[in-house]
Amino acid sequence: MNMSLSRIVKAAPLRRTTLAMALGALGAAPAAHADWNNQSIVKTGERQHGIHIQGSDPGGVRTASGTTIKVSGRQAQGILLENPAAELQFRNGSVTSSGQLSDDGIRRFLGTVTVKAGKLVADHATLANVGDTWDDDGIALYVAGEQAQASIADSTLQGAGGVQIERGANVTVQRSAIVDGGLHIGALQSLQPEDLPPSRVVLRDTNVTAVPASGAPAAVSVLGASELTLDGGHITGGRAAGVAAMQGAVVHLQRATIRRGDAPAGGAVPGGAVPGGAVPGGFGPGGFGPVLDGWYGVDVSGSSVELAQSIVEAPELGAAIRVGRGARVTVSGGSLSAPHGNVIETGGARRFAPQAAPLSITLQAGAHAQGKALLYRVLPEPVKLTLTGGADAQGDIVATELPSIPGTSIGPLDVALASQARWTGATRAVDSLSIDNATWVMTDNSNVGALRLASDGSVDFQQPAEAGRFKVLTVNTLAGSGLFRMNVFADLGLSDKLVVMQDASGQHRLWVRNSGSEPASANTLLLVQTPLGSAATFTLANKDGKVDIGTYRYRLAANGNGQWSLVGAKAPPAPKPAPQPGPQPPQPPQPQPEAPAPQPPAGRELSAAANAAVNTGGVGLASTLWYAESNALSKRLGELRLNPDAGGAWGRGFAQRQQLDNRAGRRFDQKVAGFELGADHAVAVAGGRWHLGGLAGYTRGDRGFTGDGGGHTDSVHVGGYATYIADSGFYLDATLRASRLENDFKVAGSDGYAVKGKYRTHGVGASLEAGRRFTHADGWFLEPQAELAVFRAGGGAYRAANGLRVRDEGGSSVLGRLGLEVGKRIELAGGRQVQPYIKASVLQEFDGAGTVHTNGIAHRTELRGTRAELGLGMAAALGRGHSLYASYEYSKGPKLAMPWTFHAGYRYSW
């Protein structure tokens, strides 16, 4: 035969393609050939390989660029590399096989391209097995042996059997696609693992797919201490899992996306995943275990898997990650999603891991997990779940009733939250839970064996969407130092509760969310129950150590029997100029309204919302705004005597600071500012003249509630006036004014959250002022004054943002004033005049009372009392009908003080 080939070579310069086909038909290439470039190789027949580099062939680098290989026939392989010293570089070509690679059902683990020794470098290539299924070893690339290597780039590897790497092989795949049958690394070890050396595979920016038709149990399987590193890419499909790692495998996945794909998984069970019914099994070539119920993004048993900045999405039937005996999973960043199933589930191939090997799962570096259950436990092995580094996980932690197996024990389920991690869910399955600078948002009643908190670790009883759905946390032991955020349902007499069954220690704080509803009775609200004699202490973390509930504030108190409850807080004595009673005495009874209404208990401190509602309502606030708008004649019209017999138009602005104590709410300050515009017509009559006019204005009052927040009122008013000035010095001024007031407030409750309230009301008032000026020849004058004003404020009803019900009944004010003004008229050149003055008045509020109800509890506000007022001002006639006026006032009383009031105005007379 060799002589025949020698003669052919010497006889004629045959074309390379024809010669290659002839040599391929004999099963081996001659040593004289170093490459197969730009060829089309077609083979048919048993074991007819397209390119076959045997161990006896010379080593070195060989190339096949731009080459197409097609083979068909039993166990025919497009490329078979068996020489450890050889390297085949296959670029810009394709290899296709369509023959049966198995032998009467006996697996031979052959591929369209097989590397048993040596190195394959494939670039921009297509390797396709188009004739077989997973069960018949339809493998596109098979690399096996410690002397076998492959480096694939920018290529497509397609076959129902996928890509198989085992027995110590090393493979690198970049920017490529492995389609149909997935990627499978390693094999199950025997009892002597050293018999099967681990393989190592590196994928970079490579997608792996296992379609249902291929029958591949997993899109990627890593077995028997083999190692996979993937950086970038999508893993899709698999009958039962996206990635399976078993028996000592090591998997590193970075920037990966793992999902099932559109087609249903072959192992899916209609009606939902059945974790408790999972059958132990595994994945890999050969179908060495039954397919499990549901689909798992990552299935780990006796192996280590690291996911970094990766996405795992589980369908309705399945879990994002399943962990079996001895599994170690670390998730750094990225997300795990199982909206209708379990994020993490225990189960899998127990027989391929050491007996009672613990399971460890860590979510860190901002990893996010979300599912109906965060962890579903069905194995008795010890489980440790750790959330740290800002990880955020949602879902319950649950367990099936684990069977009792003779000679074995059920290991603990331990959970650790640390470093700003957050878990949202409920549990009755956790044996120990530690929370260190992290948060557990408890969504339902829960039971924990041992709870330990540190570094402001907190348990947040989730605010319910439905009132009355309170929650109870029951623990055997409590230790450390932490924070519990709780809810109360005062109108139902219910609250969240912490119950410690065996031992409680440490210093803990309770933060209670505000409630706008009123307690159903005077009974206390129980928050914590500890065993009698426990060393644990509890304090309120709310502002000032008090909780706003409905109308009043509450504090935390222990009753000596291990119970910690909310009880009514006494109001601190407010600094007032009037004599104050001793600490916490019974206060005199308040006047009863006409209709019976609950009265506030003596000495109780109002909540922030109730205090704001009381101070915003009633007649007191509205009347002080109305009087700021009204004020005296001289500040409204200037000095009419400076321009006799003349009508005109005018405008004025004013600003005032008020300090109010209505005896129902806490003292507060209000700053008032506004303006008025008006015009009048002068009508001469015998002995004097009338000024008849109209006015309109806007006023804003800004309130500050010390330590709570504030509010404001916008007032728009219109009115008319009639002023009579007699030649004898007597004057009479009458006004009628109607106002519309828009009131609101925004305060911070004791829990730090804002509470808002607003409503609209109206007011109407009238005033009558009279006086007489006595003038001296040198310009000095003396003017006694008297004024009576009546104002009626309407009411309103509304509900604050926290649910506090408020009803303002409005009220009436009757204010009298007696004053004396002293000044001097100074004549200037050009007919101009200046008239400075000083004034002193005494004011008496005869009524000023109103009632504000919060949750049906009546609070009577009143500003009745006397105050003094001092002022100075100046009016100036500038000639040609122009005049200016300005004033300053100071007023002081026990319930209403005005440290400063400024007015300035201008009038033009014609």
UniProtKB/Swiss-Prot annotation:
- Ranges occupied by sequence repeats: 266-270, 271-275, 276-280, 281-285, 286-290
> Transmembrane ranges?
none
The record's annotation in SMART domains points to: Autotransporter
Region feature (5 X 3 AA tandem repeats of P-Q-P): 579-593
Give GO BP annotations, semicolon-separated. Answer: cell adhesion
Q: Where is this site: Cleavage?
A: 631-632
Question: Any idea where the Autotransporter domain is?
Answer: 642-910
Q: Where is this motif: Cell attachment site?
A: 260-262
Q: What span is annotated as the signal peptide, if there is one?
A: 1-34
Q: Does the keyword Membrane apply?
A: yes
User: Which residue intervals are annotated with compositional bias (Pro residues) in the record?
Assistant: 572-601
The record describes the protein's role as: Agglutinogen that binds to eukaryotic cells; a process mediated by the R-G-D sequence. Pertactin may have a role in bacterial adhesion, and thus play a role in virulence. May contribute to the disease state of whooping cough.
Name of protein: Pertactin autotransporter
Question: What organism does this protein naturally occur in?
Answer: Bordetella pertussis (strain Tohama I / ATCC BAA-589 / NCTC 13251)
Gene designation: prn
